Amino acid sequence: MAGNSIGQFFRVTTFGESHGIALGCIVDGVPPGIPLTEADLQHDLDRRRPGTSRYTTQRREPDQVKILSGVFEGVTTGTSIGLLIENTDQRSQDYSAIKDVFRPGHADYTYEQKYGLRDYRGGGRSSARETAMRVAAGAIAKKYLQQQYGVKVRGYLSQIGDVTCELKDWDQVEQNPFFCPDVDKLEALDELMRALKKEGDSIGAKVSVVAESVPAGLGEPVFDRLDADLAHALMSINAVKGVEIGDGFAVVTKRGSENRDEITPDGFQSNHAGGILGGISSGQHIVAHLALKPTSSIMVPGKTINRQGEATEMVTRGRHDPCVGIRAVPIAEAMMAIVLMDHLLRQRAQCGDVNSQVPRW
């Protein structure tokens, strides 16, 4: 009802605000006997962590995760896993000026309309700070998927503004602060970020995420289609305004003879569908893309109103990302992993005894 949970068999519930004491989550449905330590979660948290480069917010949070429950002697017990991350670098005074003013493009106005009040410190519950817990939970899912099924989930930045980044080299993604797989575009990205910082403005981005070695058969008919659940999960990430599966909106200009993924005894000849047919995984790579809007927390003055409905002007102070898409890469990976683990457990529960004789590649 309150919208703080996702998943059925693998269920993640988060809590906490940007400037509260801590962030946390409860992860239900993890099978027993899975080796798990805080170090397993910390790697992805460090990839998402703020203050790690000059291209992201300079809020410096260590994001050290604590496992509170559900793990004993280094393995999961099958009970609820409790995770906690303390907030240590809040500067709430940066937000005192917006206590009675709505930042244009943010959730200030809509939260006030829904609840009749709001935590104005850094956006409260609507802040992307909440996604730290998704990344922690997603790291559990990623480890399970890799260990039990050989599934690898990884993402990359595919576009910032007009600068597109081709998937040339996965190894490059972890070698630069942009999560960019195209080393030839790093200079252009750096120049764009410097220009935005000088202008006090921001820019949108596109992130791509790929899951390899996903078994065929995941997904439920009609309302719990795998692509529907992936779109739901990815759209729930802050600032995301659009999600594509496979070729997405590009299929509008394609002919059926071009778009269909033909099959031969050697396997599928293309993957326009992004690894999902009829809402069920085909065994191909699952591919999704998400578009993130430019943050509205910028130094460029903008028109807005106060709580009394009076016109005023807003210039956002504080520490903010010029492009929120950069740190969205590990978040997108986490959300895809959470959905895939949930559907793998659902498939195992209902169809674990199914042994199809149809070839798989």
From Swiss-Prot:
Major enzyme class: lyase
Free-text comment on the cofactor: Reduced FMN (FMNH(2)).
Keywords, comma-separated and alphabetical: Amino-acid biosynthesis, Aromatic amino acid biosynthesis, FAD, Flavoprotein, FMN, Lyase, NADP
PROSITE patterns per the UniProt record, alphabetical: CHORISMATE_SYNTHASE_1, CHORISMATE_SYNTHASE_2, CHORISMATE_SYNTHASE_3
Names of required cofactors: FMNH2
GO cellular component, one term: cytosol
Amino-acid biosynthesis as UniProt keyword: yes
InterPro entries on file: Chorismate_synth, Chorismate_synth_AroC_sf, Chorismate_synthase_CS
EC number in record: 4.2.3.5
The keyword Lipid metabolism is annotated on this UniProt entry: no
Gene Ontology terms for molecular function: chorismate synthase activity; FMN binding
Purpose: This reaction introduces a second double bond into the aromatic ring system.
Name recorded for this polypeptide: Chorismate synthase
